[in-house]
């Protein structure tokens, strides 16, 4: 009833010997062909896909509203500056209404440099030196320049939907007459 443990390996070895024995074995009948040329080609694959419509969508000094896409890109060629944000696919879009400004700076936004950390020295006179990153920002007025020196000028504050205080201009004659009445 019970097989001896030594009988199982011998049966397996007999089957193995029958399958792979001699020149007419199964292993010698398998044909192997080595590729001398790539079957489908390599350099011409993947050209049927449409372009992804990348690039700058709004140029310098163009007016944009919040949510307007300014740059579509792969990777961070342009970095977000003042009043813009970057999406998960590196799309740069507007957060505030205003005019698009492209500029270069050696520090990441908000560009706050310390006195003990001077800017790059001996910058070569080329269009885009390596020390500088390209930034996109939005200025409120077309004449404004970016980057703003936020320490000297202060941070730009915008209050959306908040009613503006109306300051009444009182003529000087009315002030003098009111002072004369009280006296």
Swiss-Prot record:
It is found in: Mitochondrion. GO terms for cellular component: mitochondrial large ribosomal subunit. One of its GO terms (biological process) is translation. Gene3D superfamilies: 2.40.50.100. Residues 1-34 form a transit peptide. The keyword Ribonucleoprotein applies. InterPro entries: Ribosomal_bL27 (IPR001684), Ribosomal_bL27_CS (IPR018261). GO terms for molecular function: structural constituent of ribosome. SUPFAM superfamilies: Ribosomal L27 protein-like (SSF110324). Keywords: Mitochondrion, Ribonucleoprotein, Ribosomal protein, Transit peptide. It comes from the Eukaryota. Belongs to the bacterial ribosomal protein bL27 family. This is Large ribosomal subunit protein bL27m. It comes from Cryptococcus neoformans var. neoformans serotype D (strain JEC21 / ATCC MYA-565).
